[in-house]
From Swiss-Prot:
Gene: purP
Organism lineage string: Archaea, Methanobacteriati, Methanobacteriota, Methanomada group, Methanococci
EC number: 6.3.4.23
Family: Belongs to the phosphohexose mutase family.
Protein name: 5-formaminoimidazole-4-carboxamide-1-(beta)-D-ribofuranosyl 5'-monophosphate synthetase
Cofactor note: Binds 1 Mg(2+) or Mn(2+) ion per subunit.
Pathway: Purine metabolism; IMP biosynthesis via de novo pathway; 5-formamido-1-(5-phospho-D-ribosyl)imidazole-4-carboxamide from 5-amino-1-(5-phospho-D-ribosyl)imidazole-4-carboxamide (formate route): step 1/1
Disulfide bridge map: none
Length: 361
């Protein structure tokens, strides 16, 4: 892990009056960049020439850093450009996937918003389970081997995959049949199969809950809630059951979009309790803990119990559902507030209070 002192040494050389908020042009970059502009920051997007259209059309980026391929963002040349811009990078799922977690931890020497040490805890299932389980949250039962499957399960794989390759099954035989099908299609590799995560299939309504932890205010804030629109499962459910059987298609769970939802108000105490518990445990296990945006992906059972099956320890794709604010983020100051603007507000306040070390790593 890059020492905090080294990152702070880099930041000390910055012109504090000309800070740039930067991120990779993908995932949740639109509201990250727009939110930064609303708070008076200059913005920069890292992109390829064939994917720069949204950032030009929406006018959210002041500066463009072009790369031949997104994996180039970890190069020393790109890092130097960012440092020359006095950049603070806001990570999201695509940034981590393209830069590479090892590079984020060891070679990407540009100040980042949040705790870069916690990103591995969302990427590796065992660490994620340790953090979520240690927080006292209700989790699906975990199966250590395909041979243990004795009922409906969901099979997942590590990293920011957007649901690609996930599948349900009910037996060991079905597990291997679907694994071999996905391998034949090039969706899964042998390495993916070795890292398969098998968990109880919980029947319930899906709620992806977006929080923001402010180290400056020591407060967990509920920012919004979304559900995912997944292909091909959400298309298959529109097909009559008799035709589904004839089609004989194994559904996929690739996230193609999100839509906002609100949760039953009587469940909000449970929602806040979950966020509080996770932040408390994160501070114990991976100091300084969960800084800034994070997400708990959950299922609400018919008994009104929220079961957490996954977390994001950075800006999550569902934040895109409230670029102009959510019903929950509106309640704090009676004004629209996106996750991107909330991040920018925290950086701005940290600079004003001369406490930037609290929010970057």
């Amino acid at each position: 892990m890059i020492p905090k002192e080294e990152i702070m040494g880099i930041f000390e050389k910055y012109n504090k009056d000309e800070i740039t908020i930067a991120t990779v042009g993908s995932h949740t970059s639109l509201h990250i960049l727009k939110g930064a502009k609303l708070e008076g920051f200059s913005t920069a997007v890292i992109t390829t020439k064939d994917r720069d259209v949204p950032y030009k059309r929406f006018g959210v980026a002041d500066k463009f850093i072009y790369v031949d391929k997104f994996s180039d963002i970890s190069s020393e040349e790109i890092q130097e450009q960012l440092r020359e811009m006095n950049a603070i990078v806001v990570p999201h799922g695509s940034f981590i996937a393209y830069c590479g977690l090892d590079n984020v931890e060891s070679t990407f020497k540009v100040p980042m918003f949040g705790n870069r040490a916690i990103l591995r805890w969302e990427a590796e299932r065992d660490l994620e389970g340790q953090l979520l389980g240690g927080s006292g949250l209700r989790l699906p039962k975990k199966y250590n081997s395909p041979d243990e499957i004795d009922g409906p399960v969901m099979v997942k794989f590590p990293g920011a995959r957007g649901g690609r390759g996930y599948f349900p099954c009910s037996s060991t035989e079905e597990f291997w049949r679907k694994i071999n099908d996905f391998k034949a299609k090039g969706v899964l590799s042998e390495e993916d199969v070795k890292k398969a995560h098998i968990e109880e299939y919980v029947v319930g309504a899906n709620y992806c809950i977006h929080y923001f932890y402010s180290p400056l205010k020591d407060r967990v804030e509920l920012m919004g809630i979304d559900r995912r629109y997944e292909s091909s499962i959400d298309g298959l459910v529109r097909v009559p059951s008799k035709d589904q059987l004839e089609l004989d298609i194994d559904p996929s769970y690739v996230i193609t979009g999100n839509f906002p939802v609100v949760i039953r108000e009587s469940l909000l105490p449970q929602v806040f309790d979950m966020g509080d518990k996770l932040c408390k445990k994160a501070e114990e296990l991976v100091k300084p803990g969960m800084l800034g945006p994070f997400c708990l992906q959950s299922l609400c059972t018919e008994n009104l119990e929220l079961v957490v099956f996954e977390m994001s320890a950075r800006s999550d794709g569902g934040n895109n559902t409230f670029m102009n604010g959510s019903p929950y983020s509106y309640l704090y100051n009676a004004e629209p507030l996106s996750m991107g603007q909330r991040i920018a507000k925290e950086i701005k306040l940290a600079l004003e209070l001369k406490m930037i070390e609290k929010v970057i790593s």
